[in-house]
């Protein structure tokens, strides 16, 4: 419990007092960009990414220690038959990450990214959100605090991902709780739900949001009641990154739901974040639009485990390299426009 009283109090205080961008670093980056050997705007969004890096790190754009952080959790709602896979797959995939056998491992090698995987009490699933809150306030706050430690080893670009059987059900419930609409609008196949399994998934989301309806005006209550440990940990990691001047790339539908909690608590909470990709999960683009973001990639992926964010990190690294490595007109002896 925080020294100030209730477990969430310290997080509410952080969310009220988020640091802003470094305007001097942003101005310096824009000035340098204007001198590089290219027409203004010719690198398109790469230029905006370089400016974003400068603004949120407070220094010239560079990516030297990129990190993919994957948070793994299990969910009591799987007892409702919302997924074709057993919850044991979560732990098995964590072992696969450790052995280097997952897609995210290959992408990290290809783009020279660090990888950390956080096992969040997989033997103790959260409460079934159709019957009770996923977490107590104390447990949710403790998991957020744990997530904040993801960047303790040092990084200058954080990619946020997850693993958790049943967590697209959780993401759909969070989005329905935050934004309204219908369960059908937010529920998708996830790991392959179809037919009766998909119908049970929709019913579970409807039941959960109805059960907790009276508590959904508070985003942190949405998180603890409808979320899960990986949701809380990702929210904590994104928040810690903001406090420590680390830009963030958010992965897919589930990671976007975690980010949405912070955005609902403070409209500026995700200004240091990019959305790495839009997944093929039907509700993801709608969720991204609710955040006022534009994804970097659209590759038809729906794997999770940070893969879309990691691929986007390659683009961010390229943006920084162009900004820092290109010659200026003066250095190259190339004539600038009149």
UniProtKB/Swiss-Prot annotation:
Gene Ontology process terms (BP): cobalamin biosynthetic process
Keyword Transferase carried by entry: yes
Pathway in which the depicted protein is active: Nucleoside biosynthesis; alpha-ribazole biosynthesis; alpha-ribazole from 5,6-dimethylbenzimidazole: step 1/2
Enzyme class of the recorded protein, top EC level: transferase
Catalytic activity: 5,6-dimethylbenzimidazole + nicotinate beta-D-ribonucleotide = alpha-ribazole 5'-phosphate + nicotinate + H(+)
Alphabetized GO MF terms: nicotinate-nucleotide-dimethylbenzimidazole phosphoribosyltransferase activity
InterPro entries, per database record: Nict_dMeBzImd_PRibTrfase, Nict_dMeBzImd_PRibTrfase_bact, Nict_dMeBzImd_PRibTrfase_N, Nict_dMeBzImd_PRibTrfase_sf
EC number: 2.4.2.21
Active site: 305
Keywords: Cobalamin biosynthesis, Glycosyltransferase, Transferase
Protein role: Catalyzes the synthesis of alpha-ribazole-5'-phosphate from nicotinate mononucleotide (NAMN) and 5,6-dimethylbenzimidazole (DMB).
Similarity remark: Belongs to the CobT family.
Listed HAMAP family: CobT
PANTHER family to which the protein is assigned, alphabetical: NICOTINATE-NUCLEOTIDE--DIMETHYLBENZIMIDAZOLE PHOSPHORIBOSYLTRANSFERASE
Protein name per Swiss-Prot or TrEMBL: Nicotinate-nucleotide--dimethylbenzimidazole phosphoribosyltransferase
Lineage, uppermost ranks: Bacteria, Pseudomonadati, Pseudomonadota, Alphaproteobacteria, Hyphomicrobiales
């Amino acid at each position: 419990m925080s020294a100030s009283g209730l477990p969430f109090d310290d997080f509410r205080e952080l969310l009220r007092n988020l640091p802003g961008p470094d305007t001097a670093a942003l101005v310096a980056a824009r000035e340098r960009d204007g001198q590089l050997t290219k027409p203004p705007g010719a690198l398109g969004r790469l230029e905006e990414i370089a400016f974003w890096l400068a603004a949120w790190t407070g220094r010239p754009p560079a990516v030297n220690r990129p990190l993919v952080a994957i948070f793994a959790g299990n969910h009591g709602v799987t007892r409702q038959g919302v997924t074709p896979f057993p919850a044991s797959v979560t732990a098995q995939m964590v072992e696969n990450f450790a052995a280097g056998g997952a897609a995210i491992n290959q992408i990290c090698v290809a783009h020279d990214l660090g990888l950390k995987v956080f096992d969040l009490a997989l033997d103790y699933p959260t409460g079934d959100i159709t019957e009770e809150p996923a977490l107590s306030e104390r447990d949710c706050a403790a998991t957020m605090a744990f997530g904040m430690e993801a960047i303790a080893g040092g990084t200058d670009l954080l990619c946020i991902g997850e693993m958790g059987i049943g967590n697209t059900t959780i993401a759909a419930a969070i989005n329905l709780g935050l934004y309204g609409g219908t369960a059908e609008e937010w529920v998708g196949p996830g790991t392959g739900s179809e037919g009766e399994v998909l119908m049970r998934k929709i019913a579970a989301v409807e039941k959960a949001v109805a059960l907790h309806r009276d508590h959904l005006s508070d985003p942190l209550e949405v998180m603890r009641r409808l979320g899960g440990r990986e949701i809380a940990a990702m929210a904590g990691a994104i928040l810690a990154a903001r406090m420590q001047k680390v830009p963030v790339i958010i992965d897919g539908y589930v990671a976007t739901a975690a980010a949405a909690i912070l955005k609902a608590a403070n409209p500026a909470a995700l200004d240091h974040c990019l959305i790495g990709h839009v997944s093929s999960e039907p509700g993801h683009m709608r969720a991204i639009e609710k955040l006022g973001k534009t994804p970097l990639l659209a590759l038809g992926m729906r794997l999770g485990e940070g893969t879309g964010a990691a691929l986007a990190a390659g683009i961010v690294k390229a943006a920084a390299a162009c900004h820092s490595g290109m010659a200026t007109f003066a250095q190259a002896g190339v004539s600038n426009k009149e």
